[in-house]
Design a protein with these regions (language model features):
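Intrinsic-disorder-associated, low-complexity terminal segments enriched in Asp/Asn/His/Tyr and depleted
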Residues: 4-5
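Noncatalytic, basic helical substrate-engagement surface that gates or grips nucleic-acid strands
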Residues: 8-114
Length: 114
């Protein structure tokens, strides 16, 4: 049947909103630290979500997106953009480069765009 043939040719892409998943994991999980004292709860939670998504959706491709550090054009256009949002916790900010390194090791492209 033609429909079955088309369905086998369709490729599946999964896009992970890196900052959103890390932020959610950071606040959802208790502080987890390595033997060196580095907090890794956001990394752990991110990887749980990431591997669950890979297992559930079986994508052909996966990419991750991350926000650029402020200020961006949104801050320039809208002075109130995220104005009331508290500063990101240092313990969370320190985990961002680490998860990017992990994703790079897994050959997952990372996109950051203003």
């Amino acid at each position: 049947m033609i429909t079955d043939n088309i369905m086998t040719q369709i490729k599946r892409l999964i896009i992970i909103d890196g900052h959103a998943v890390l932020h959610r994991a950071f606040h959802a999980l208790p502080p987890l630290t390595t033997q060196k004292g580095e907090q890794v709860n956001a990394i752990y939670g991110f990887l749980l979500v990431f591997f669950k998504a890979l297992n559930e959706f079986r994508p052909d491709f996966a990419v991750a997106t991350f926000d650029l550090p402020a200020p961006t054009f949104r801050h320039q256009e809208f002075k109130e953009y995220k104005a009331k949002r508290p500063k990101m916790a240092d313990e969370l900010a320190e985990q961002i480069p680490k998860i990017k390194n992990i994703l790079t090791a897994f050959s997952v492209p990372i996109f950051e765009k203003e």
